[in-house]
Amino acid sequence: MLELNFSQTLGNHCLTINETLPANGITAIFGVSGAGKTSLINAISGLTRPQKGRIVLNGRVLNDAEKGICLTPEKRRVGYVFQDARLFPHYKVRGNLRYGMSKSMVDQFDKLVALLGIEPLLDRLPGSLSGGEKQRVAIGRALLTAPELLLLDEPLASLDIPRKRELLPYLQRLTREINIPMLYVSHSLDEILHLADRVMVLENGQVKAFGALEEVWGSSVMNPWLPKEQQSSILKVTVLEHHPHYAMTALALGDQHLWVNKLGEPLQAALRIRIQASDVSLVLQPPQQTSIRNVLRAKVVNSYDDNGQVEVELEVGGKTLWARISPWARDELAIKPGLWLYAQIKSVSITA
């Protein structure tokens, strides 16, 4: 568990945090440049020193301004991966990985190397590596120090699109197989969608929202970040069954289900899906003989006018689903809170 209750002033910027983060999964730190994202993880890592408050990791006090406690970075058991990999140019990859390696991680070396797909790189110098390869090595080096927490400061920011696509699957694999909590700084919605369990939104050094990805994503805090045509819902589902005759998989959403193209995941596997509001249409009665496979019973929570369109907030199986319709459709269907209807979903994307 990471307890953050501190304030810090750097130049004209003031960062104030009072949150407790669970000791598992990935928490994305999100916001514009200058919002305080890097300042936050620098304070946690010990690169800067807050003027007020405390930082406590798994019961160990890293910072306590009143008591004058400020552990040095090397005593914090916190790994840090920067935007640029910062590898030692005169060491081969193997040497970079072993630099600072904890004795407790010696037996884990081969497993971690395989997990990150860097075994073929062990005898190469950093200068011969691609940007994505360098970042995989940097992540491996940080993990081999046996940290209790891993900080990643926009690790994909300096990479081109092909290299980002190369690195994302390795980060996703890490989240599944390495039981180390991570703070992931990013201003990329795509990265957050694919990686984060939770999101903390910072603005001018203040926390605007903090919670599960699907909750924060559907909140008004994210509206400025989402172009109107990209308003969407993030939902947690589980694999329910695979169709016996067609290449389709059913995903459980409450007591209802969604059909998607066949997945390789086993039954009961947990997934996260994204549904664009523009891919959801509404009808008052169950449609007959329709080509749309996904028709869900839903209740209207509210509706909002938005530049000539209407955003309809629905509840499906205790989850929030958004639909975008025209004012004409709203009036003709008499959309109002509490109305039960059917949501027709044209497309579903798997995000994680």
From Swiss-Prot:
Residues 289-352 form the Mop domain. Keywords: ATP-binding, Cell inner membrane, Cell membrane, Membrane, Molybdenum, Nucleotide-binding, Translocase, Transport. SMART domains: AAA (SM00382). GO terms for cellular component: plasma membrane. This is Molybdenum import ATP-binding protein ModC. Belongs to the ABC transporter superfamily. Molybdate importer (TC 3.A.1.8) family. It comes from Shigella flexneri. The keyword Transport applies. It is a peripheral membrane protein.
